[in-house]
Swiss-Prot record:
Its biological purpose: Involved in DNA damage recognition. Binds DNA containing O(6)-methylguanine and larger O(6)-alkylguanine adducts, and to double-stranded DNA that contains an AP (apurinic/apyrimidinic) site. Binds to the damaged base and flips the base out of the DNA duplex into an extrahelical conformation, which allows processing by repair proteins. Works in partnership with the nucleotide excision repair (NER) pathway to enhance the repair of the O(6)-alkylguanine adducts larger than the methyl adduct.
Assembly and oligomerization: Interacts with HelD and UvrA.
Gene3D superfamilies, sorted: Winged helix-like DNA-binding domain superfamily/Winged helix DNA-binding domain (1.10.10.10)
Top-level taxonomy: Bacteria, Pseudomonadati, Pseudomonadota, Gammaproteobacteria, Enterobacterales
Family classification: Belongs to the MGMT family. ATL subfamily.
GO molecular function terms noted in the UniProt entry: catalytic activity; damaged DNA binding
Keyword DNA-binding: yes
Keyword DNA-binding listed: yes
Keywords of the record: DNA damage, DNA-binding
Sites annotated Arg finger, required for nucleotide flipping: R66
Residues flagged as site, Required for phosphate rotation/nucleotide flipping: Y52
Result after altering W83C: Does not confer alkyltransferase activity
Protein name: DNA base-flipping protein
Length: 129
């Protein structure tokens, strides 16, 4: 069985998220939901965003958008997974306060235009997986 891409992500083996997952790293049926979420989020290219719902759909659970948020919220401190590339279905950052600003700054650093209120133009920046 393949070593989970997600586990390698957290060990720092896949620092370059700008490339999609190689063919041999495709998700396995046995992968847990969090593992599938990690793999999908890792594949979002720099300068693009996707929605919690899109990630859930790609993970095989189209009604699990909130669970995607929960998986990302529980990432360990210092995780290199690009969690900041996931926004709500309206193209808005769902976080508030300092967390909103942290996500906004990370996206701005990648060239994604984000309004002061956390709004992103999904037509321009949405990842077309």
């Amino acid at each position: 069985m393949l070593v989970s891409c997600a586990m390698r992500l957290h060990s720092g083996v896949f620092p370059d998220y700008a490339e999609k997952l190689p063919q041999e790293e495709k998700m396995e049926k046995e992968d847990s939901f969090p593992q599938r979420v990690w793999q999908i989020v890792a594949a979002i290219p720099e300068g693009y965003v996707t929605t919690y719902g899109d990630v859930a759909k790609l993970a095989g659970s189209p009604r699990a958008a909130r669970q995607v948020g929960g998986v990302l919220k529980r990432l360990p401190e210092g995780s290199t997974l690009p969690w900041h590339r996931v926004v709500n279905r309206h193209g808005t950052i769902s976080l508030t306060g300092p967390d909103l600003q942290r996500q906004r700054q990370a996206l701005l650093a990648e060239g994604v235009m984000v309004s002061g209120s956390g709004q992103i133009d999904l037509q321009r920046y949405r990842w077309n997986y």
